[in-house]
Amino acid sequence: LKCNQLIPPFWKTCPKGKNLCYNMYMVSTSTVPVKRGCIDVCPKNSALVKYVCCNTDRCN
């Protein structure tokens, strides 16, 4: 799996076991991702932070 980095068009190959790509957004600015990368389990959203996860190459 390859996930986008925060600075397009760069991406990285995920290590074994981290088979989701994710975008992390601040709820206050939910259009601009704060962090992107590979993760094993999609984190739960909180009052301040929203996560969007997906499982195909460079889908974040």
Curated annotation (Swiss-Prot):
GO molecular function terms attached to this record: toxin activity
Which CDD domains does UniProt cross-reference here? TFP_snake_toxin (cd00206)
**Tissue specificity, please?**
Expressed by the venom gland.
Q: Which InterPro entries match?
A: Cytotoxin_Cobra (IPR003572), Snake_3FTx (IPR003571), Snake_toxin-like_sf (IPR045860), Snake_toxin_con_site (IPR018354), Toxin_cobra-type (IPR054131)
Subcellular location field: Secreted; Target cell membrane
Q: Which domain of life is it from?
A: Eukaryota
Keywords linked to the UniProt accession: Cardiotoxin, Cytolysis, Disulfide bond, Membrane, Secreted, Target cell membrane, Target membrane, Toxin
Gene3D superfamilies membership: CD59
Q: Which family does it belong to?
A: Belongs to the three-finger toxin family. Short-chain subfamily. Type IA cytotoxin sub-subfamily.
Query: What quaternary arrangement does the UniProt entry report?
Result: Monomer in solution; Homodimer and oligomer in the presence of negatively charged lipids forming a pore with a size ranging between 20 and 30 Angstroms.
| Function summary | Shows cytolytic activity on many different cells by forming pore in lipid membranes. In vivo, increases heart rate or kills the animal by cardiac arrest. In addition, it binds to heparin with high affinity, interacts with Kv channel-interacting protein 1 (KCNIP1) in a calcium-independent manner, and binds to integrin alpha-V/beta-3 (ITGAV/ITGB3) with moderate affinity.
Q: What else is known?
A: Shows very weak hemolytic activity.
Protein's recorded name: Cytotoxin 3
